[in-house]
Swiss-Prot record:
Belongs to the TRAFAC class translation factor GTPase superfamily. Classic translation factor GTPase family. EF-G/EF-2 subfamily. Its main location: cytoplasm. The gene is fusA2. It comes from Syntrophotalea carbinolica (strain DSM 2380 / NBRC 103641 / GraBd1). One of its GO terms (biological process) is ribosome disassembly. PANTHER family: RIBOSOME-RELEASING FACTOR 2, MITOCHONDRIAL, TRANSLATION ELONGATION FACTOR G-RELATED. The lineage of its organism: Bacteria, Pseudomonadati, Thermodesulfobacteriota, Desulfuromonadia, Desulfuromonadales. GO terms for cellular component: cytoplasm. Catalyzes the GTP-dependent ribosomal translocation step during translation elongation. During this step, the ribosome changes from the pre-translocational (PRE) to the post-translocational (POST) state as the newly formed A-site-bound peptidyl-tRNA and P-site-bound deacylated tRNA move to the P and E sites, respectively. Catalyzes the coordinated movement of the two tRNA molecules, the mRNA and conformational changes in the ribosome. This is Elongation factor G 2.
């Protein structure tokens, strides 16, 4: 089967936003207008096509990024709907990695909210071109100009409106298109599928003229040929203006802004047009780079069907009907179902079973995938998120993804022996799907410990264990992922000697332990001169120290941000071994850490609370009682926004508390910010609790 749509006519985009900005609804409308779904799915009916896991339909939020494909103006648009809840930022990170462009949806009332900032920073990191869509223009308190200004101020982005709204709140009826200089009004009866072009309303003419001037000037600033024409007083044609916007948008020099109300079916077709007109095709973005495995030689894989096959797996899911589904993005080349590919990350060959094009949770079987496609494969056994799949004859390793460390964990115990076996398999599958979920066994208690990005994240994992995998388990209260560190430098000897007849053991090293900058992690430095410890034993010292750091000296939490330098020692010709030096390194580290004034560290979260004025005092008082530090306040659409840093340990159950304190009128978001030292009194309580 030949390629249906050329690369130039392919768009891979994500839809990203804060929770409740209306992202899934926007995607639903896109699917409706492009003719993929014949009935509009509403999120609050629990019927949205993209939200297909049971938990998503119950909670009305999007958890996994479903990939779907649709057509508009002869172009193929692959859309990835990403979750907006902060516990699921990894989903956003992994989808941004494989997109060429993104639509950022903002709520016209709330404007730029904390999660929007997090997602925006992730998109900056991967240099993803964006279009902004200010949604919910029909809501009370809708304010387009404030939305545009917040994108400029809070996100530091050059937001340039391509449209202005006609009316607002209940009177929102259409938009003025500043590119084509025409007014568009939607017809409510045809669900917004029909619209008419009318004269620009006289009361808007002045705003429209200045908006148009700003747009033309801004586009010309980034294009010399257009600038010369503009300064020479010549008229810039529609085609030149559109090309200029496209170029500036792809280079992330401007962020085009559109507006509408997806729920009321207004503005979605224009958004689709903008995706086609201004978002990059796979050919317009820089070619992806990778390295040749083993040689570290850098290579690029430009988009095109002629090159060798190279793809990145960005999501693994367990599907009740076909088993494991691996979603991947093809960067170059072509592959057929049944083909053998190399997983360059693991250096193992895999075979594509069936290849599927996904439409939320419906699937269409395909025979081939081409450069620029996003598809799913059945039958890959070893591949996990972030792995590279490539042509075995032309191996190439694309850069993988980085995932944040989990901040919260819970203990979980299966109720019966039967559940025990099922739980092991189920957790194995879930970890493969979600790299931010960690599973380990606590050696002392024998409990299974799950670590994740937040309470909601772990709640949903437990829920899936019960629903999808039918595992019954007792779940402990969530625990904070404390860490330990040292606060002063020490020098210490680690010596392990056993010499009582026969082959003995002898390892002797001198270590210097120094505190590092927060976030620097563990570092081992070899400063041995003159062979006082033979080369081959030095890594063992480092390994011993690193393993000892897993269980700290204050309360058994991992020790972080420490630099260990091995600078002296001695050895025995016969009795020294790697094992002996590993034990010596471990003994030295433990002794040193205990002397180096060790302290407990706790995760501190950036908490933003949006609260009506009358509850302000209560909420501030409550944050202080949770050891929170208020960093600042500002007004946003009739409510107050409080920014603060609060230790995670004091935030358990905050959602319920906040709801009852403000009669459900306040909302909050929480993102991990940094680790900091625990106050002495609280540290003593924690130690007593752990050792008790």
């Amino acid at each position: 089967m030949a390629r249906q749509v050329s690369l130039e006519k392919t768009r891979n985009i994500g839809i990203m936003a804060h929770i409740d900005a209306g992202k899934t609804t926007t995607t639903e409308r896109v699917l409706y207008y492009t003719g993929v779904s014949h009935k509009i799915g509403e999120v609050h009916d629990g019927a949205a096509t993209m939200d297909w896991m049971e938990q998503e339909q119950e909670r009305g939020i999007t958890i996994t990024s479903a990939a779907t494909t649709c057509f508009w103006r002869d172009h193929r648009v692959n859309i990835i709907d990403t979750p907006g809840h902060v516990d699921f930022t990894v989903e956003v990170e992994r989808s941004l990695r494989v997109l060429d462009g993104s639509v950022a949806v903002f709520c016209s009332v709330g404007g730029v909210e904390p999660q929007s900032e997090t997602v925006w920073r992730q998109a900056d990191k991967y240099r993803v071109p964006r279009i902004a869509f200010i949604n919910k223009m029909d809501r009370i308190g809708a304010d387009f100009d404030r939305g545009v200004n917040m994108i400029r101020e809070r996100l530091g982005a050059n937001a340039i409106p391509l449209q202005l709204p006609i009316g607002k709140e209940d009177n929102f009826s259409g938009v003025v298109d500043l590119v084509e200089m025409k007014a568009i009004v939607w017809d409510d009866e045809s669900l917004g599928a029909r619209f008419e072009v009318v004269d620009i309303p006289a009361d808007l003419q002045e705003r429209v003229d200045s908006g148009r001037e700003l747009l033309v000037e801004e586009v010309c600033t980034h294009d010399e040929a257009l600038m010369d024409k503009y300064l020479g007083g010549e008229e810039i044609t529609l085609e030149e203006l559109k090309n200029g916007i496209r170029k500036a948008c792809i280079d992330i020099k401007i962020i085009p802004v559109l507006c509408g109300s997806a729920f009321k079916n207004k503005g979605v077709q224009n958004l689709l047009d903008a995706v086609i007109d201004y978002m990059p095709s796979p050919v317009d973005v820089p070619a992806i780079t990778g390295v040749v495995p083993d040689t570290e030689e850098e290579i690029t894989r430009p988009a095109g069907d002629d090159g060798p096959f190279a793809a990145l797996a960005f999501k693994v899911m367990t599907d009740p009907f076909v088993g494991q589904l691996t979603f991947f993005r093809v960067y170059s080349g072509v592959a057929e179902s049944g083909a053998t590919v190399l997983n360059a990350t693991r250096d193992k060959k895999e075979r594509f079973g069936r290849l599927l094009k996904m439409h939320a949770n419906k699937r269409e079987e395909i025979k081939q995938v081409y450069s620029g496609d996003i598809a799913a494969a059945v039958g890959l056994k070893l591949t996990t998120t972030g792995d590279t799949l490539c042509d075995p004859a032309n191996p190439c390793l694309l850069e993988s993804m980085e995932f944040p460390e989990p901040v919260i964990h819970i203990a979980i115990e299966p109720k019966t022996k039967g559940d025990m076996d099922k739980m092991g398999q189920a957790l194995g599958k879930l970890v493969q799907e979600d790299p931010t979920l960690r599973v380990r066994t606590d050696e002392e208690t024998g409990q299974t410990i799950l670590s994740g990005m937040g309470e909601l994240h772990l709640e949903i994992i437990i829920d899936r264990l019960q629903r999808e995998f039918k595992v019954d388990a007792n779940v402990g209260a969530p625990q904070v992922a404390y860490r330990e560190t040292i606060t002063k430098a020490v020098e210490v000897q680690g010596k392990f000697v056993r010499q009582s007849g026969g082959r003995g053991q002898y390892g002797d090293c001198w270590l210097k332990l120094e505190p590092q900058e927060p976030g620097a992690g563990y570092e081992f430095v070899d400063a041995i001169k003159g062979g006082v410890i033979p080369r081959e034993y030095i890594p063992a010292v480092g390994k011993g120290a690193e393993e000892a750091a897993e269980n700290g000296v204050v309360a058994g939490f991992p020790i972080v941000d420490v630099k260990v330098t091995c600078y002296d020692g001695s050895y025995h010709d016969v009795d020294s071994s790697e094992m002996a030096f590993k034990i010596a390194g471990s003994m030295g580290f433990k002794a040193g850490a205990a002397k180096a004034s060790p302290v407990l560290l706790e995760p501190v979260m950036a908490v933003e609370v949006v609260v009506p004025e009358e509850y302000m005092g209560d909420v501030m008082g409550d944050l202080s009682s949770r050891r929170g530090r208020v960093l600042g306040m500002d007004a946003r659409g009739g409510a107050q926004v409080i920014n603060s840093n609060v230790p995670l340990a004091s935030m358990f159950g905050y959602a319920t508390e906040l709801r009852s304190m403000t009669q459900g009128r306040a909302t909050y978001t929480m993102v991990f910010d940094h680790y900091e030292q625990v106050p002495k009194a609280i540290s003593e309580e924690i130690v007593a609790r752990v050792k008790g």
